[in-house]
Amino acid sequence: MALVIYSGGLDSTVLLYKLFSEGKADGALSVNYGQRHVKEIECARQNCARLGVPFEVADISSLRPLFGASSLTDYSVGVPDGNYADENMKSTVVPNRNMIMLSIAAARAIAIGADSVAYAAHSGDHAIYPDCRPEFAEAVESALKICHYT
């Protein structure tokens, strides 16, 4: 069973519904890191209620100033418009965001007895987001396997 890191956006919603349909969704965790699109968390809550999947929110929004000038967290930085392949989309990078969320989710997964954490990174993301690359996922998986006594 998996704990799903669930923003409430399209990618993680598809992942949650897929795992739920397979009987593998143990719970869902949204992380409020001070993002502008925090309204997605309410969508996540509603979808989890609809499915009967336990839902929690980790509020780390007080860390927002530490993330620097990302257009997703800093209201003084404009949100770019256009194709994700465009150079200007790099302003949407929140440094180390997935590592932070995966660490929090791994701790929660251990606490609730889930045997894995799932997050919706995909190949369309990793051209812009370094923490969506396959080598990142593999490295984090290796680290998480040794960070807890099983």
Language-model-derived ranges and their functions:
Residues 1-150:
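ATP-dependent adenylation/nucleotidyltransferase module used to activate substrates
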